Amino acid sequence: MKRVFNFSPGPAAIPQEVIQQAADEMANWRGCGLSVMEMSHRGREFTEILATTKDDLRSLMSIPDNYKILLMQGGAIAENAIVPMNLVGMKPQPATIDFVNTGHWSIKSIEEARKYANVNVAASSEDQNFTYVPARDTWKLTPDAAYVHVCTNETIGGVEFDFTPDVGNVPLVADMSSNILSREIDVSRYAVIYAGAQKNIGPAGLTIVIVRDDMLGHALPICPSAFDWKLVAEHDSMFNTPPTYPIYIAGLTFQWMKRQGGVAAMEKVNIAKAKLLYDYLDSTDFYVNNVPAANRSRMNVPFFLRDASLNTKFLTEAGQNDLVQLKGHSSVGGMRASIYNAMPIEGVQALVDFMKAFEKKYG
């Protein structure tokens, strides 16, 4: 069976072992005579899948007992509305939300939050085209803010937080859609973590929300019941029918990660993959990456050919070498290699080898 190296930013590569196991179990999950896709979400079989998936995620991330794991729908885009609808009610209205703006996805969160609260952009890297993370001592926070929001990895700009910010007693909320499970973090430093699944966890359609217990029960009256975290938690993520098959694939991915050695092992490999690609980019003038080393993303590596007229040739010839989905986002152009957990280091080496050959041919 032919497989290519898929550098898509999302939906992204899924571990080959996971795809093979899902294929083997497609028509008959563990001898029950059913595909997971046709199981009742309240049946014994899926209840087992759901419980195991949540337990494995809790184990992988060392999630404390006073946090709920919610398996929802709508992606991080929906959570941009769901988060404020669940949290601004903790403060007298109109509440204020503090944001750190590091790029495209931060801006999406800011724009949506304005519908529900006052927004204070406490820090921004727009002055340098979103190529860095503002130092914590430059943030101008609101003392009584409902929460502080950060996007820990910007997929388009290739910028990633390399620290967990101290925001005092104000709840810290993080969109970790593109770097969840890629590096070790202390979950207890965050009040809420949310992530679309389609980058490091599984197929599109599932959203992970990790929420501290004291953040529950504050939903605004306008919040739809299906988006009220307290109700979702009370119904064990089954207030409405959950995305059963994406949950199943997420569970297989978590089991795969445990076999690899957990998040610590993933982080070690991710550091090696990123170093391999960035070291080459820094060694040549043929390609360029504009992000300072301290803020470079381990997950998404944007780069540009100095001669942009070669872009189409680069993508075409990369595809001929089984290296796909390397086109940069339309807002910035160039190229982008997304090297999430499922991308083996062999894929990054193949990309670097191709880039060297392409430079030799056209440089």
From Swiss-Prot:
Pyridoxal 5'-phosphate binds at W105, T155, D175, Q198, N240, T241. Transmembrane segments: none annotated. InterPro entries: Aminotrans_V_dom (IPR000192), Pser_aminoTfrase (IPR022278), PyrdxlP-dep_Trfase (IPR015424), PyrdxlP-dep_Trfase_major (IPR015421), PyrdxlP-dep_Trfase_small (IPR015422). Its main location: cytoplasm. It is found in: Cytoplasm. Signal peptide: none annotated. It comes from the Bacteria. Its EC number is 2.6.1.52. Keywords: Amino-acid biosynthesis, Aminotransferase, Cytoplasm, Pyridoxal phosphate, Pyridoxine biosynthesis, Serine biosynthesis, Transferase. It catalyses: O-phospho-L-serine + 2-oxoglutarate = 3-phosphooxypyruvate + L-glutamate; 4-(phosphooxy)-L-threonine + 2-oxoglutarate = (R)-3-hydroxy-2-oxo-4-phosphooxybutanoate + L-glutamate. GO terms for cellular component: cytoplasm. GO terms for molecular function: O-phospho-L-serine:2-oxoglutarate aminotransferase activity; pyridoxal phosphate binding. Binds 1 pyridoxal phosphate per subunit. Belongs to the class-V pyridoxal-phosphate-dependent aminotransferase family. SerC subfamily. Catalyzes the reversible conversion of 3-phosphohydroxypyruvate to phosphoserine and of 3-hydroxy-2-oxo-4-phosphonooxybutanoate to phosphohydroxythreonine. This is Phosphoserine aminotransferase.
